[in-house]
Structure formats: C-alpha cells, structure tokens
Amino acid sequence: MIQTLSKLKVADNSGAKEVRVIRNLGGSVRKFTGIGDIIVCSVQSATPGGAVKKGQVVKAVIVRTTRELKREDGTYIRFSENAVVIIKEDKSPRGTRIFGPIAREIKEAGFAKIASLAPEVL
C-alpha cells in the first residue's frame, strides 16, 4: 500500500531515481493507492543532466508494489519493490525506457504505451 510520504523507486530513464508521494489522486479522503493509480510526487534524488530535476513536482503511475494484488482468476502477484513511472499530462511516459517487469493491470488501466515499453509484463 502506497500512502502519502512513501518513498518509491523510479523505473524509467527520465532522470529521477527516487520520489516521495505528495498526494494520492482519485478522491479527497483516499489514503492508499495501488498498481495503476496516478500519484503526485516530489523528486528526492535525480541523475545529473536528466529531464527531471531534484525537487520538481511530477505525476507518476504505480507499476510495482510489495503488497500482493489479487487478480480475477484468484491468483496473487507481488513484487520485491515499490516503483513508479513518471508520466506527462497526456498519460504518456516521460522517459523512453522502462526498467524491470510491470503488472498487466497497467495496460488495462489505460497505459498501453508504458506496457509496450516494458521488457516484461506479468
């Protein structure tokens, strides 16, 4: 479960390495978010010369969580880390590469471009 002030890894090459959650979008009293949800983040650490700078406020979509996600067929999927992909206003990824696997629920949530860039969709 991702909540306000959680620190997450960035799974793309936008220049950010780690972000901190400022706001969970999708409701005024929403406390937790999961895979496929959009969040507002502050960049905590970034690589020099990247498109995203430290301290910048960005939107991101959650692609991996350590909390298990139950699928409709009864199976569960869980990842070893919490990770996000930074997105633009039109929900397209800011970077050109995605690192690590992502859940197929990302594609079902309307992020087909992120799913096509990922090396593995579980």
UniProtKB/Swiss-Prot annotation:
The keyword RNA-binding belongs to this UniProt entry's keyword annotation: yes
Keyword rRNA-binding: yes
GO CC terms in record: cytosolic large ribosomal subunit
One example of a Gene Ontology biological process annotation: translation
CDD domains for the chain: Ribosomal_uL14 (cd00337)
Endpoints of the signal sequence: none
Coiled coil regions, renumbered to chain: none
InterPro entries listed in its UniProt record: Ribosomal_uL14, Ribosomal_uL14_bac-type, Ribosomal_uL14_CS, Ribosomal_uL14_sf
Positions of disulphide bridges: none
SUPFAM superfamilies: Ribosomal protein L14 (SSF50193)
Keyword field: Ribonucleoprotein, Ribosomal protein, RNA-binding, rRNA-binding
GO MF term (any one): structural constituent of ribosome
Quaternary data: Part of the 50S ribosomal subunit. Forms a cluster with proteins L3 and L19. In the 70S ribosome, L14 and L19 interact and together make contacts with the 16S rRNA in bridges B5 and B8.
Family listed: Belongs to the universal ribosomal protein uL14 family.
Matches recorded under PANTHER family: 50S/60S RIBOSOMAL PROTEIN L14/L23, LARGE RIBOSOMAL SUBUNIT PROTEIN UL14M
Protein function: Binds to 23S rRNA. Forms part of two intersubunit bridges in the 70S ribosome.
Protein name: Large ribosomal subunit protein uL14
